[in-house]
Every structure is written in C-alpha cells, then in structure tokens.
Design a protein with these regions (language model features):
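Extended hydrophobic leader/signal-anchor segments used for secretion and membrane insertion
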Residues: 2-242
Length: 242
C-alpha cells in the first residue's frame, strides 16, 4: 500500500505593510519638497536663468528669438533667501560672450555683448578693424566683416573693467558709446540655445520684456507658437552650446 504524503507547505499570508501615521507622512513629504525647492533656488541662482534675445546687436551669432540658458556660476551667484552674493572669482576671456548689467544706464535692460578688451588693454578702432595692443584682432564672428566700424578711436581699459562690443557692429550700443563694463556688472555667460523662434516683429522693435528674467508671458507665448507654427522654429540652432 503506497501512502502519499502531502509535503506542500502553505505560505503564511503576507502581513500588510504598516502605513506611517498621517502626520509622519506629511512631515516626510514636506521635507522632500523643502529640498526640491532649495535645489531649484540654488540652480536658479547659479545657472537656470532663461533669457530671450530681443535685438539684432549680436547677429549672426545670436538671433532675435534665441532662447538661452545663462550660467551665473563664478560671476553673479546669489544665495537663496538672502541678499548676499558669492564673491566673484571667474574672469571672462577675450572674445567670450557675456551678459552684463547696463552700466551708466539706469533702468535699462541687461546687455549681451562680446568681450574685446581686457583690463590694461589698449583698444583701437580704425580703418574698419579692431586692434588690441597694436595687433589686429581676428574676428570671424562679425556679421559684416568688411563694413566700417564707427566711431574710430582709442581706449585704454582700466583695471577691473572690460571693453565690450556687439557682433553686429552697425547695430550695437556698446562700449564705443557708453564706456567700459566694470567687473561687478558681469552677470554671467550663455551656456546653450535651447529654443530659437523666428517670431515676426515690426521693424526696429525690440522685445526687452522677453530678455529680462521674471517676464514669463513672452516665453509661454513663444512655446505655444512653436506648437501651433512649428515652421517658425529654427531647428538647426537648438542645443547649440557656447
């Protein structure tokens, strides 16, 4: 007589995972959101600022409707929840593109220009060319390299100051007209073009409200325009790094 022994072991039912009390869950979520917000504010203070090019002064390097991510790291880093700023420790290089607070122009929007003269440099403009300390500066980025540059003149850049110009020399309001850019007016440098929209505008019109931070409506309008009119997007300019 064969006896079959049932060796199946019944598994004990899993006990439900005990849930944390409501107050403890709320505390955990509050802590998580605190760190998320703090990280966002830190990134916004150091990098994270989006800017939109409003004028033709930097064509053809930057076009009207280019949306930039700007890095403030090393230039104008603010500490969240405080009026304090981290001391500046980075200096721009010659021909680097920088974003500056408009010196000597109260209430004017920030400017984006290219560094031409460093502290101590002698900058000369004559015969349609720029000379640094007696040597002609090679400028392959100019929109119209053969066009005359006005006004002609000679400038000796003081310590802790920079001589900046736009790449579109015939349509740029820069150091030739308002003088040097002090070191402490440098805000940051562009990192990447994340969007470029060919938005029509009236001749001579500039969109300064789109350029300065905090004016989000113009950007949201541009994003919506991209969805409705994808042909306006300059796809070849997206994700261009500087």
């Amino acid at each position: 007589m064969n006896l079959k022994v049932d060796t199946t072991i019944e598994e004990a039912p899993e006990e439900p995972t005990p849930q944390k009390p409501l107050g403890q869950r709320a505390k955990s979520e509050a802590i998580a959101w605190f760190w998320i917000i703090l990280a966002f504010l830190f990134i916004y203070s150091c990098v994270g600022q989006a800017r939109v090019i409003p004028s033709e002064s930097m064509e053809n390097t930057l076009l009207v409707g280019d949306h930039l991510i700007m890095s403030r790291f090393g230039y104008d880093m603010g500490l969240p929840f405080t009026p304090w700023h981290v001391p500046l420790w980075r200096n721009p290089k010659r021909q680097q593109i920088v974003i500056i607070r408009a010196p000597q122009l109260e209430g004017a929007p920030d400017l984006i220009k290219r560094v031409i003269g460093l502290p101590g440099d002698t900058v000369e403009i004559h015969d349609g060319h720029v000379f640094i300390n007696g040597s002609q500066l090679d400028e392959p980025y100019l929109k119209e390299p053969d066009s005359p540059i006005e006004p002609s003149g000679k400038w000796v850049v003081p310590p802790a100051n920079y001589f900046v110009m736009g790449d579109n020399r015939g349509d740029s309001y820069d150091s030739r007209f308002w003088g040097y850019a002090p070191r402490n007016t440098l805000i940051g440098v562009p990192v990447m073009i994340y969007l470029s929209v060919d938005a029509p505008k009236a001749p001579g019109e500039t969109r300064t409200e789109a350029w300065n931070p905090g004016h989000l409506m113009e950007r949201f309008t541009a994003y919506a325009s991209c969805l409705i009119h994808p042909s306006r997007v300059r796809w070849g300019r997206l994700f261009h790094f500087f």
